[in-house]
Amino acid sequence: MPVYTPQSGSLPEYSKMKLLYFSNELPKDDLQGLFRRLYNHSKDRRYPLLARFIHEATLAVREEVRQLPTAVKALVPAFETVLNLADYPELRKGPLGGSLEGVLLCVLEIATLIGHVPRLYFKEAADCCSYYENASERFDLHAVSTYLAGLGLGLLSTAAVALCSALADVPVIGAEVVRVSFRLGTLVDEISQNLEPRDTSGSPDTWASVVPGAKVEEVQAELDAIHAREKTPQPSKIFISAWNEGSVTISGPPSRIRRVLRLSEFFRRHRVVSLPVYSGLCHAKHLYNEQHAREIISTRSMDSINALYSPAIPVYQTSTGRPFTASTAKGLFEQLVLELLTQPILWDNVVQGVVDQAYATSATSCDVLVFRISVPINDLRTALGSKLQGFETSTEELIPWILQKSDMEIPRGTAQSKIAIIGMSCRMPGGATDTEKFWELLEQGLDVARKIPADRFDVETHYDPKGKRVNTSHTPYGCFIDEPGLFDAPFFNMSPREAQQTDPMQRLAIVTAYEALERAGYVANRTPATNLHRIGTFYGQASDDYREVNTAQEISTYFIPGGCRAFGPGRINYFFKFSGPSFSCDTACSSSLATIQAACTSLWNGDTDMVVAGGMNVLTNSDAFAGLSHGHFLSKTPGACKTWDVNADGYCRADGIGSIVMKRLEDAEADNDNIIGIIRAAATNHSAEAISITHPHAGAQAYLYRQVMSSAGIDPLDVSFVEMHGTGTQAGDSVEITSITDIFAPITKRRSAQQPLHIGAVKANVGHGEAVAGVTALLKVLLMYQKNAIPPHVGIKNSLNPLFPKDLDKRNLHIPYQKVPWPRVKGKKRYAVVNNFSAAGGNTTVCLEEPPLRETDYVDPRTAHVVNVSAKSKISFKKNLERLVAYLDANPDTSLASLSYTTTARRYHHNHRASVAATDIAQVKKKLLSYIDKVEAHKPIPATGPPQVAFAFTGQGASYKSMNLELFHHSPYFRSQLLHLDALAQGQGFPSFIPAVDGSHEKDYAHSPVVTQLALVSVEIALAKYWISLGVKPNAVVGHSLGEYAAFHVAGVLSASDALFLVGRRAQLLEEKCQIGSHKMLAVRAPLADIEKALEGTNYEVACINGPKETVLSGSQAQVEVVSEILQSVGYRCTSLDVAFAFHSSQTEAILDDFEEAAKDGVLFRAPNMPVISPLLGKVIFDDKTITAKYMRRATRETVNFLSALEMAQTFSTVDEETVWVEIGPHPVCMGFVNATLPAVNETVASMKRGEDNWVTLCNSLTALHCAGVPIEWNEYQRPFEKGLRLLDLPTYAWNDKTYWIQYNGDWALTKGNTFYDAEKSLKAQQTGQLASVPSGLRTSTVQQIIEESFNGSAGKVVMQSDMMQPDFLDAAHGHKMNGCGVVTSSIHGDIGFTLGGYLYKNLVKGGKAPDMNMANLVVLRGLVAQKNTKKPQYIRVTISTTDINSGVAELIWQNVLNDNTADEPFASASILYDDAALWLKSWIPSTHLVQGRIEALERLAEDGIANRFTRNMAYLLFANNLVDYAQKYRGMQSVVLHELEAFADITLSTEKSGTWTIPPYFIDSVAHLAGFVMNVSDAIDTKANYCVTPGWKSLRFAKPLVAGAKYRSYVKMIQTEEDPTVYLGDVYIMQDGAIIGMCGGIQFRRYPRILLNRFFTAPEEAGAISHAAASSTPAPRTKPEPVPVATPATAAAPVAQSPAAPASVTPAPAPAPAPGPTPAAAPAAAGESDSVAAKALVLIAKEAALELSDLTDDASFANLGVDSLMSLVIAEKFREELGVTVTGSLFLEYPTIGDLRSWLLEYYN
C-alpha cells in the first residue's frame, strides 16, 4: 500500500472501491465511557482537529440552546463541552430527546472519524502528528472510488465528509452537521407533539414498530383498511417509514399504533416489535415539506459554509439508492434533511446502488468503513459477495480507536496538562513532624486529640462546659502540634525578635515549604520550569490567632509583617526569590484545598510553571474556640472527629501545616522529578441551595463530583478511594455520604466486584485542621499511593451513623476498619478523590491519579561520583552528615550515581560544606564519618563571595604519547568540543588528532609532533570549555610554553582556528627544519642561581624557570648529557624530558622567521578579555598591542619564566592567596610550580592525571573547588546522565531549632470590652489639631491661622499654625520634589518669615512705614516632607517674637505639631532684620562690575566649549535626574552657563497665579536655586555617589520686589570650605538690567552620600505620629555640631526618617574604609574594651535583636543575624539615645559585619 508523506501533496489514490457508512444508532455499550475517552483524546496534542471540532460543536449547540423557549431551555444543564451531554441520559427521553440523540450520534461519528483517519495509513504516532500538520492537504476519502452512505440521522453525518476537501475542514462543517441535527430534532418534536402530546407519567412510548416477515403491500392494505374504518385524519395516519425484503417499519402516534396493534388480527399474527424511537416522526411525506427543510438549514453559519464548500464525494439516498444531486453545500444539507423528513428508508435500494456502482467501475474489492458492524452492513457484504463473482469485501470498525489507550500522552496545551505533585512536607498533631511520622500515626489508627496545652491558653479558666461564663469555650479538647514555637531563625535570615513576633504557622509554612522543595529536588533556575519568575506560592489560612492574641499583648516592630496573612506566602516568595504570584486564601475550612485548586488553575492557565501550595493553622486564640462552641460546631466530648459515628456531635479543632510542590506533569517528567501523585482535575462550587450558609447540600456536592470527573475524563466507578471531608457532624456526614454514593457508588449502575470503593476521613485521626484540613487529606492519599495501603478509619467509636445508606455492601462501598492493601494493578490506574468543604458553603474536590512507575536499566559510565552535604550552621551541618550516614546504613543498596545527582544537582549548597569523591557507598560513608569527627574544626566558606579562579595551561612536557580519555567517551560536551576542534584542524590541512586521545592506539604509541601538539592544545581548550560549562570560569590565565596557545584562546586573544593553525604550523616547521632527538631538555630540581654556579663555564641554555627550585635546561644532546652529569654529581636531581624537540632553545631558531611570517598572515590577535599572565615577559597583559606575531616568535625561542610571571601577577593583585588554581592539561605540572612560588595559595586542582581515570581526578577536583566556594554548575555536570539517574528521597535539612514564642498571659480575652470611655470629642480635637484662633485679618497660603498674639509696647509675639495639606501649601511643597516626595523648600520658609515679619512690625509700630526686611541666619535642622495621607492635616507652627522692635530684630522658630496638638522641638530658626533697601543697593554697586565680569568670562568659556550651556528643559531635566524635580512654575531659569562651581542663569519668573503670598516661593526659588543646580549638576562634584543640600543662608534680601514675568539674571560661585571639605559656601547675586537687586548671601551646601537619600527624604504616612523622642534635636556630638540636610533654593530639608523610633539626626560620623576583617572571635575581644562604646553597642544590638552575645562574632554579618532595614533604624535610634552615637540606618550597609562595626566604633568613639 502506498504511504502518505507530507512531500507527496495528497493522500494516495486507490484502485479499489471504498464505502464509509454512518449508522443511525448510538452504541449499546457504555456511551458515557466512549465520550469520556473522546474527551481525553481531545486533550492530546496529537488530536488538535478533534479538539477544535468538539469546541465548534459545543458553540453550535450552546447557540441553539439559547434560542429555545425558556421552559425547554431550563431542562438543559450547564455543560462544559457537548460531550458532557452524554452524562444526562434522562434528557434523551424528554422534549429535547431527538435533538440530543442526533447531536450525540453526529458528534460521536464525526469525532471518531477525525481521530481514526490518520490511523488508516500510519502506525506510528509521530507520523500521525505529521499528518495533522499537513491536514490542509486532501485525504484519501476523496479518491473517485469513495462513496458515503448512512441511515437515519447518520445520513446527516455524511455531509461532514462529502463537503470537505481536507481533514482540516471537518471541524467547521461537522459543527454545522451537529447544529442541523439539533434543529431537526426540535422541529420533529414540535410537529410530533401537535399530533400527540408526550405522556410524562410513565415510560416514553415508541413512535415506530417493525413488522417482521410481512410484505409492504400487505401492510399498506391493512393500514388503509384501518384508516378508512376508523376515519383517521390524514396527519394522524400510521404510515410505512421503511421496508426491505424481510420486514416493514410502521410509524405514527404512539396511542394509534397501540390501538392498531391491539385491534388488527394481521399485526397480531406478525409479532410486531417496538423500536426505540421516542422523539417523534420522520420519513413522513404527509407531515413535512421543502419549507420545513429550509427552515432547519437557514442559519448564518450555513451561508458561510455554502460560500466555501461544495459536494466532493457522492452520498447515497436511502430511498432510491442513487447519489444525491446537489451541487452546493446548502443544497446537499437541504436534500439530506428532506430525505430524513419525507422519504422512507429502502436499504435494499442502497445495497443495489453499491452493487451497480461496483459493476460499472469494474471494481474487484471494497473497503467498508463502519463505526460498528450492524445488520445493514452484513446485508451489504452478502449482496456484494453473491451478486459480483470474486468480489472481495473488507470491513474495518472505527469505534475501537476510541477505546485504545495511548502509550504516549502529550497535552495539547497547559490547560490540558495533568498536575504532578513532586514534593511534600508537614507538621501535624501527635508528633508527626514529617510525612513518615504522619503515615505511622495513620497506619496505627491513632486518635491524637488531647486537652488544650498550656502554651496556648489556660484551659481551666477559658473553658466552661455549661457555656454560662462569657467568652469561654464549651470544649477543652483539640489536636495540637508539639512545640509549634520551634524554628531555625538564622537559617531564614530572621532575628530572634522578628521570629518571636512572627506567627508560628507562617514560620512552619516556610519551613515545610523548604522541606517540600528540598524533597522535590528544587534548585532555582535549573530548568525552564524552575525559573524564579515562573514560581508562585499559594497558601490557605483562615485565622490570625497569634497576631490577635499573643503579639497583640505588646505590639512591636513586626506586628504587621509577622502576623498578617498576606505575609505568609509573601515571606516564602521573598526568601526563595520567587517572582511569581503569592496568594493567601481564606475559604474557611476548605482554604487549603481551594488554594491548591487555585494553584492548579495558575498552572493550567500558564501563569506559573511551578507552585508551592498548602495550608496552615496554629490555634492560640480562645475566642475562636468560644465562637465555634456557641455556633454548635465543636464536639464537647474527648477524641478527634467522630466521623460517621452514631454519636458524632461536632468536630475537634486541630493544628497543622502542610506544603506541596506542583508542576505540570510534562514539566516534572522533563525535569526528572519524583512524582508522588497526579492531580487530574480540581474544582470548587458553592452550596447555594442549602437551607443555611453553614449547612451542606448533597446536590451541590454531586454536581461538583460530576464536573470534576468529567474534566478528568474518568469514570466515577473507576475511583477506588474517596477521602471525605468527614468532620463528624450529623448533618455534614450524612449529606456527604449521600452525594458520594449517588455519583461514585450508584445503585442503578453498580460497581463490579473488581471495583471496590473505600472511603476514609483523616479528621478522625488528627482532628479538623480548618484551613489545613484539605492539604492534610491530600497528604494522606499521597502517602497511601507510596505505601500501597489504605489506613484504618478510627472515627466510628460506637456504631455507624444510622443516616448512612443501608446497602453499602451492595454498592461495593467499604469503610476500612483495618488497614487494607491498595496495590498497583497492571493495566489500570488507581484514582482517588479528596473532598474539602467550607463552613461558608464552598465545596472543593480534587481527583488524583497514582504516580507513574519509573524503571530504568541504565548504568552510569562514570567510575567516581561526588556527594555533597551542607548547612548554614555548624550544628545543622553535623546533623545533616549524621542523617545521611544513617540513611546509607538503612539503605546499603543506594545507587551512588543517584546519590551524587541528588546531593549535587538537586540541592541548595550552604556555607558549611562537606564534599567527598567516592567510587562506592562504603567510601562515601567513611569520608562522611571523618567529616563528623572533625566538625568542630570545620570552617565555612567565606561570606565575601566566591574566590577568584586562575587557569594554568600545561606545556608539552606533561603530555603522554597516546591518551585514552574517559571524558572523550562519556562526556558529550567534551567530546563535541574535541570533534569540532579536530574538524577545524583537518580543515586547515592537518591530520586528525583524535587517534591520539580516543585510545585507539597503545599508550606508548608515538604520534607525529603535529598530531601530538594539536592533541595537547585541543584537549586543553576542550577542558577549559568543559570547566567553564561547569561554572568554573577563569579570572586570569597563564600558559606554560605550548599551553600558552590554549590560554590565549580562552582569554579571547586567538580564535580556536587561529590557535590550532599556529600550533600545527609550528609543529610542521619543526618537523621540516629540525632534527628529532638532536637536542634535549633537562628538568633540574634546583634554583637557577645554584645551577649557574655549578655549571659555570659549561654550554647550556635556560629553557624554563618554573619555580624557586624548578628549572629546565636545553641544548644539544651532547651538551645536555654533560650538564646532567655535572649537576647530578653535586646532588641535584635531573630528569630528561620525553620531547621531540628542545623548545625555547637554539634548535628552534631555524623556524622562527617562517613561523613569524605565518603568524602575521591571516592570524588576528585581539585584546584579552581577562588578565593574561605572560611567562615570556614576566608581567600581566591587559592590552591588545603586546601579543603579536613577534610575541609568538619570542615565546617559541626565549625562556619561559613562570616564576617571575607568577610573582608579578601577585604583585599586581591579579592573583592572591585566595585564588583557586585549576590546571588545564593531561597531567598536573604547573600546580607544583604555583604551590612552590605562592605557598599560601588557597587551592590547586588538576583536570586530569596520568594513570588515573578522568572521572576520579575530576571528582576530586570538584570536591575541592566546591569546598573552596567556587559555584559549580552541578546540573550541567549531571545533565548528560540525568535520564538514568533518580532523585532520592533523602533526609531533609536538620534544623537548628530554638523556641520563639510569646505566651498569652492572663484571661483578658474573657474580660475584654467591658469598660468604655467617652473620649470622642477629645479625640476628635486631638486628631484635627484645631485650636481657637485669634481674630486676625492675616491669611495667606502659608500663614493660615493666627493662634496666639500679644503686643506689649515695643515687645510682641505672634504664633501662627498652618496645615500643609491645604491645597496651595501642598501644591507649593509638591512643586519641589525630592526622591519622589514633596519637600518644603526654604523659599517657603522665606515667604513665611517675610509675612510674619511684616505683620509683627505693623502691629507694634502703628502708622509707621514698613521697613525692608532681611531674612537672616536661616538654619534648618530637619527638613519638612509632605505626608502621604492628604486626608489628615499636617500642621506646622511658626513663632515670631521680639523684645524690642526698635532693635530692628525679630526671631523666628519653626515647629511640627504632634497628634496631641503639642509643638515638637524647633526644627528651624531665623532672624528678621528690619533695614533699608537703599543702603543695600548702594553697598552692592562695587560688586556689580565684578559679578558682571565673571558672567562675561563664563560666556567666553561657553563659546570656547569649556563651560557648559544648558537650555531650560535640559537644566531642569538634569536637576530632576540628580535630585530635585521642580514644577513648571518653579522653573524660572531659561538658560544656564556652568563651569566647575561657578554659573550664571537667565531667569523669567512665572506668570502663573496660584495662592496668596508675600513673596511667592517659586519666585524666590527661581532666582536663588542656581546654587543648588551648581552643587548637584556640576562635574566638579561626584553627583553619582553624592548629593548636596543646604541647611540655610546668612541673608536673604530683595531691594526690589520680584515681579511675575520679569527677567532677571543670577550668578553664584560656590567655594569649598577649608575646615570641612564636605561644606561649600557661596553668594547668589540677583541682577536686573545690569544692577544687583537682591542677594542670597552665605548660602551653605553640605555633601552627603547618595545612599542616604531614601533615609532623609521619604514621605511619612502621617507626620504627626512622630514621637517627641524621634523629633528631638540631635545631642551634641564630639566635634563641632553641624546641621542636618535641609532645603533652600534647589533642595529640601532632610526629614526625620519616617519609621518607628527613627533618629532625628542624620549626620554620619567619619566613615573610613573598613580594615581587613579579623579572625572570628566573640566581640569584644580585648580585655580593656568592656566599658567601651563598642562593647556597649554590641550589648545593645544583642538586646534589641534578641541575640546572645556569643552570636556576635566578628565575622557574623548583620544580614545573616536578621538585622534588616527596619531593625537597623531601631538600633540606630538606640545608639543615639543611649550611647550618644549619631549614626544612620545605612551604617550596617557600610559596615556589614560585627568586626567592621566594632573596629569603626573603637577608632572613632574610644
Curated annotation (Swiss-Prot):
Q: In which pathway does it act?
A: Secondary metabolite biosynthesis
| Annotated SMART domains | PKS_AT, PKS_KS, PKS_PP
**Gene3D superfamilies referenced in this protein's UniProt entry, alphabetically:** 3.30.70.3290, 3.40.47.10, ACP-like, Malonyl-CoA ACP transacylase, ACP-binding, Malonyl-Coenzyme A Acyl Carrier Protein, domain 2, Polyketide synthase dehydratase
Which one Pfam family would you cite for this protein? Ketoacyl-synt_C
Provide ranges: composition bias, Pro residues: 1709-1721
Upon gene disruption, the observed phenotype is: Impairs the production of monodictyphenone and any of the intermediates of the pathway.
Segments of this protein annotated with the region N-terminal hotdog fold: 1344-1479
Identify which residues the record assigns to the active site.
Answer: 589 (for beta-ketoacyl synthase activity), 725 (for beta-ketoacyl synthase activity), 768 (for beta-ketoacyl synthase activity), 1376 (proton acceptor), 1565 (proton donor)
Q: Where is the PKS/mFAS DH domain?
A: 1344-1654
Give start and end of each Carrier domain.
Answer: 1728-1805
Kind of enzyme, top EC level?
A: transferase
Residues of the region (Malonyl-CoA:ACP transacylase (MAT) domain) are: 951-1270
- All copies of the Ketosynthase family 3 (KS3) domain together span 416-850
Q: Where is this region: Product template (PT) domain?
A: 1340-1659
Q: Which UniProt keywords apply?
A: Multifunctional enzyme, Phosphopantetheine, Phosphoprotein, Transferase
Would the keyword Transferase be found if you checked this record's keyword annotation? yes
- Residue ranges of region N-terminal acylcarrier protein transacylase domain (SAT)? 30-283
Q: What is known of its domains?
A: Multidomain protein; including a starter unit:ACP transacylase (SAT) that selects the starter unit; a ketosynthase (KS) that catalyzes repeated decarboxylative condensation to elongate the polyketide backbone; a malonyl-CoA:ACP transacylase (MAT) that selects and transfers the extender unit malonyl-CoA; a product template (PT) domain that controls the immediate cyclization regioselectivity of the reactive polyketide backbone; and an acyl-carrier protein (ACP) that serves as the tether of the growing and completed polyketide via its phosphopantetheinyl arm.
UniProt-recorded name of the protein: Atrochrysone carboxylic acid synthase
Record the organism. Emericella nidulans (strain FGSC A4 / ATCC 38163 / CBS 112.46 / NRRL 194 / M139)
